């Protein structure tokens, strides 16, 4: 719902992040084996309030996987369109494209703004092309940046997981950028500053 998203974007999310931190603390309290372990929060939604998330989770490392928006925007729109259509037949691909094109642009701009004002050591950058070339090395770099000891067993476990979860073994994600009312040129123009970095 666009009006809800617009409202949410104006609200202070600090209490929500404090509540989230408390939930994780409760999880660790309930299961002593989790104590002292790192948490991984994976969602691009954190980009809309990254400054707040970093304030509440003061020792968090932000891992940013950089991929060309020409690929990610239509892919994300396709995923969202699939999710939306589960709940409504009135939602069109073009409606999803219009909404998420703007939202992803806002998130990216927000990320770049927060990044420019934050200590460099809070961030770990991973180029998607490098991740595809050598996922174990990239995983090792991320873990080391997060202060996690990378033992030979960890490297072996990563390699085994990657071997068991090959991208080629999954069905391809098929979509056409024009289905969402978008074009490569539109994306290149909207994300020009991000794509230059």
Positions of the model-derived regions?
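PAPS-dependent sulfotransferases, especially Golgi type II membrane carbohydrate sulfotransferases
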Residues: 1-18, 24, 28-31, 76-197
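Conserved phosphate-donor/acceptor-positioning beta-strand/loop module used by diverse small-molecule
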Residues: 42-43, 53-78
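Flexible loop/turn segments at secondary-structure boundaries
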Residues: 15, 46-51, 70-73, 132-135
């Amino acid at each position: 719902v666009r009006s809800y998203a617009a409202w949410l974007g104006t609200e202070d999310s600090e209490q929500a992040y404090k509540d989230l931190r408390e939930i994780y603390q409760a999880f660790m309290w309930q299961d002593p084996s989790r104590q002292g372990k790192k948490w991984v929060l994976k969602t691009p939604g954190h980009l809309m309030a990254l400054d707040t998330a970093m304030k509440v989770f003061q020792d968090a490392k932000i891992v940013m996987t950089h991929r060309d928006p020409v690929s990610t925007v239509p892919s994300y729109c396709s995923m969202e369109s699939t999710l939306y259509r589960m709940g409504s037949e009135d939602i069109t691909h073009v409606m999803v494209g219009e909404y998420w094109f703007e939202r992803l642009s806002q998130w990216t701009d927000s990320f770049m703004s927060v990044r420019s004002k934050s200590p460099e050591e809070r961030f770990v950058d991973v180029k998607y092309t490098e991740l595809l070339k050598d996922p174990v090395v990239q995983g090792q770099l991320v873990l080391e940046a997060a202060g996690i000891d990378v033992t030979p067993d960890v490297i072996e476990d990563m390699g085994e997981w990657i071997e068991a979860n090959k991208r080629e073994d999954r069905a391809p994600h098929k979509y056409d950028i024009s289905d969402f009312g978008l074009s490569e040129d539109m994306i290149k123009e909207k994300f020009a500053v991000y794509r230059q970095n």
